[in-house]
Amino acid sequence: MGVLDKDQVATFKADGVIHVPRAVDGALVEEILQSVDGLIDSPGRFGGDMSPGDAPGMFFQDRYLHPVRPDFRRFAENSGLAAMAAIATNSKNIRLYYDHVFVKDPGTQEQFVWHQDRPYWAVDGTQICSTWLALTDANSQSSALEFVRGSHLWDRTFRPEYPALEGLPPKEVERALWKGVAEYIESFEDICPAFEEHPDLYDVVSFDVLPGDVLLFDFRTLHRSGPNDGINRRAAISWRWLGDDAVWAPKVGADPIIRDEDTTLEEGDLITDDRVFPLIYGR
């Protein structure tokens, strides 16, 4: 666990995403899945069903669990994926930004549009990535992730869309969220096209995954997930990892799980606040 070979590292650097089969032990995957199932009945502060009230199915999400749930902190430490992130990003140290759970039931039509994680996160750097651990089978029919290969190298950050508010004018998004979001959204000139409709221009790839498989991707890599038109529930957990050059970069449009007042860091500081960003791996 946590080991990548030279070819995998080279692919990650070129494509911004790699598929690592059987990256996490099956017993740990089952233990994580049991904890995730329990979250649905008793979600955390940031958890809940993201589907509209009258929509079929369920798109459950929860995040930032490791500070309040010892089991989720242990999962991050024992998965071996921080070491994998260190190898992929060529970092000596890896800190945990947050964990993020996704559960999508069959028939759920809710989806994530094309996006990069960068504009939603209050950090910046070139050694920042996610490991998306499959807890169930998933394929293109059942909402497996899709990526635009090489998009992390474009030196472009696309306009963010916010869950359940996709396509709305920025002012309407701001009314639903918080002050300043409209101006933040409008500061991005590039708007994501339908990359999948232009195979001659963009290299879109998806991966069929089994429980224990991991998708490791750069936080600048464009990605999305579609509806679950399969017959089984799709569940996964992501850990967001910060490598050596990650800095604190608060943004008005960033996820409010960690705010300026929550950390001792000043804008532009290297991430060193152990209380808020625990060191999971060091070498």
Model-based region annotation:
Residues 1-15, 21-114, 119-122, 252, ...:
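Non-heme Fe(II)-dependent double-stranded beta-helix
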Residues 92-94, 98-99, 110-112, 127-133, ...:
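Generic beta-strand structural signal
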Residues 115, 122-140, 208-211, 216, ...:
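Short, conserved beta-strand element in jelly-roll/cupin
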Residues 140-221:
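Double-stranded beta-helix
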Residues 81, 91, 106-108, 138-140, ...:
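Short, charged/polar surface micro-motifs in flexible loops or helix N-caps
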Residues 117-119, 128, 223-228:
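Glycine-rich phosphate/pyrophosphate-binding beta-alpha loops
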Residues 46-51, 161-163, 211-216, 220-283:
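Non-heme Fe(II)/2-oxoglutarate
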Residues 108, 113-114, 125, 141-147, ...:
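A short secondary-structure junction signal
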